[in-house]
Amino acid sequence: MMNHDTESHVKISRTIYRGVSPSTTRLESRVRELEDLLDLERDARVRAERHAADLGFQVDALSERLDEAGGSTTQTQELLKRREMEINKLRKDLENANASLELAETSMRRRHQTALNELALEVENLQKQKGKAEKDKSHLIMEVDNVLGQLDGALKAKQSAESKLEGLDSQLNRLKSLTDDLQRQLTELNNAKSRLTSENFELLHINQDYEAQILNYSKAKSSLESQVDDLKRSLDDEAKNRFNLQAQLTSLQMDYDNLQAKYDEESEEASNLRSQVSKFNADIAALKSKFERELMSKTEEFEEMKRKFTMRITELEDTAERERLKAVSLEKLKTKLTLEIKDLQSEIESLSLENSELIRRAKAAESLASDLQRRVDELTIEVNTLTSQNSQLESENLRLKSLVNDLTDKNNLLERENRQMNDQVKELKSSLRDANRRLTDLEALRSQLEAERDNLASALHDAEEALHDMDQKYQASQAALNHLKSEMEQRLRERDEELESLRKSTTRTIEELTVTITEMEVKYKSELSRLKKRYESNIADLEIQLDTANKANANLMKENKNLSQRVKDLETFLDEERRLREAAENNLQITEHKRLQLANEIEEIRSTLENLERLRKHAETELEEAQSRVSELTIQVNTLTNDKRRLEGDIGVMQADMDDAINAKQASEDRAIRLNNEVLRLADELRQEQGNYKHAEALRKQLEIEIREITVKLEEAEASATREGRRMVQKLQARVRELESEFDGESRRCKDALAQARKFERQYKELQTQAEDDRRMVLELQDLLDKTQMKMKAYKRQLEEMEEVSQITMNKYRKAQQQIEEAEHRADMAERTVTVRRVGPGGRAVSVARELSVTSNRGMRATSMM
């Protein structure tokens, strides 16, 4: 559909070329100016595309180099992939722009009535390209001189690298001597290790003896604990017996008191009985005479009672005596028991003191046993650490040997790279010879292009003659159009009745236009919101990419720091080894001192305070010996630190020499790559010039064919110009507006293309500076971050441009509405001024044709706005 519209537009422009309106000259000049500007914009676009292709090629080459340089990190690869995706996206955008521009170019080519300006512009472009080729030639000559100077510098750098290699060989010999010293120290360490292992075995035997003694002490402790338990049990039994004896003593004391009371009662009874006996005797003496007869009868009873009482008294006296004796014996037993109780109390106190002393000794023995066990564990741990440190020292020695081997390999690699640089210098010389040969070919091609330029000038002269003929035909068509204008003015008076229907149709078409414009506005707003969301998502993605790039930059900074730390680790390796050795010797002294302390403490358990004093003196003497050993070790550490500083200085000199050699190698590689890129660029430009020449030749032939077709169509258009003059003028005006809008779009697209070309050129310059500083990856990533920020700004600028375009379309809509209102006003004025007359069928047909032309113009305007 779009192609059909463009073809109709082209046909309209070709038919109007011989119109009869007085404003056609102005419109035609405007059309020619627009076409000239479009041609200039197209040529600028072609140059921008060519330059963008070159920049894309260079960006691809530099991206490959960046891939090779940053292959160690996956994050930089992802970043480069994103950059490639963005470049591909930009290429797609350029291709889409190119496609749209090509479509516009085809439509403009069909509309163009002459090709003279294009041929003149092609000639000017060829001249400009010739001047550009000459400038490139001079630039290449200057670059060849620079390359020769760089080759001289490379030879000088080679000589300096050879001298540095000799210095590195001397340093390598010195490092070999240092490795021999380290090997000798390793043998000494192995001897010390064997001595330590023998001492470790002795310590293990001593430890076993200590463990046996600890077992004996534990057995003695258990026996002492059992004795203490027996003594505790016996003490408890004695306490119980004492309590029982005290209870018996109290019970006996109570019995004694009872017996004493009974004895007192019995003695009182005996005294009472004696008093009664005396009374009885007195009664008997008094009553002897009275009771003489009874006395004689009762004497036997009395004697019997007396005998009973005497027996009772004797029994009581015997019991009292027994009780007195028992009391005396109890008193003696009491005194004896009190003495025994006092003795038992003193014995219990002594036993408690002995028990507390034994408990204290048992606790001391337990603490001593735990200390001995802890020290034995510490000794075993220290022995294990010494063995692990010894293994670490051996591994570090092997690592030093591997580092020495790596240095030798790097030396060999530098020699191979030196030979490769010599080969590259030879290849550069051959490429210079090829470039000179290509320059001669370019000069021959220039002569051919000058001959073709002469041919094009002759063709231009022929085209100017054809243009003169076409001007004559145009004047004739102008006269015909004037005649047609007079006829149309006569018919215009006859179309008063048609104005009402025309007004209705215009109002209807205006309503349709308003509906379509509202739909277009809604569609455009939705499209604008979608584009805005898409650009916002792109901005968010770019911000995410910026964050990832920042993270990648931080990771690369960390890796750079890690690489620098690696060199520092190599420098501090000897210091660590010496520190480990010092720690091992200190640990050995500590273990020996602890062993002696253990032996002294075991002897302290067996011996007295005098042995402890002797052991203290012995420990002081050993401390003095340890201090002397520490002083000797400090002297050794000082010597080792001096050796370390000397080795650090040698390593720094070697590192600087290696950095200089690597920098010289990279500089030569960069120069070779730049020369290869320049040679490829010249070859591409040569091919492009050949393609441009072929394209110009084909375009010239095509334009000749189109000129013939245009002349035929112009002759056909002369017949139809009398009928369609006014309609064609209106369409021409609409087409001029469309061309102006297209010219604005083309100018914007050209500006965008130029901005993209400038951006590509800026990216090329940035990438070129990155290629020169390829070794510093952090700066390259910073440049990539800057580019992403610029791209974010470009997207924001594009979003703002889209908003500006929407504003422009709204302004155009308002302008079109104003034009419609002005047309209605003019129609009203014409309706009021033109006399009301009946119109014929011819006039009605003209009005219907005019109405159809107006509706078609509005439809075309609506499609162009969409």
UniProtKB/Swiss-Prot annotation:
For the region Nonhelical region, give the residue spans.
1-22, 840-866
Q: Which residues form a coiled coil?
A: 23-839
Q: Where does it live in the cell?
A: Cytoplasm, Myofibril
Cleaved signal peptide residues:
none
Q: Does the keyword Oxidoreductase apply?
A: no
Q: Reply yes or no: does the keyword Cytoplasm apply.
A: yes
- Its primary localisation, in coarse terms, equals cytoplasm
Keyword terms of this UniProt record: Coiled coil, Cytoplasm, Disulfide bond, Motor protein, Muscle protein, Myosin, Thick filament
- GO CC entries: myofibril; myosin complex; myosin filament
InterPro entries (UniProt xref)? Myosin_tail
Which superkingdom heads the taxonomic lineage of this protein's source?
Eukaryota
**PANTHER family named in the record:** CINGULIN-LIKE PROTEIN 1-RELATED, MYOSIN-6-LIKE
> Whom does it interact with, and what assembly results?
Homodimer.
* Family note: Belongs to the paramyosin family.
Q: What does this protein do?
A: Paramyosin is a major structural component of many thick filaments isolated from invertebrate muscles.
Task: Tell me what this protein is called.
Answer: Paramyosin
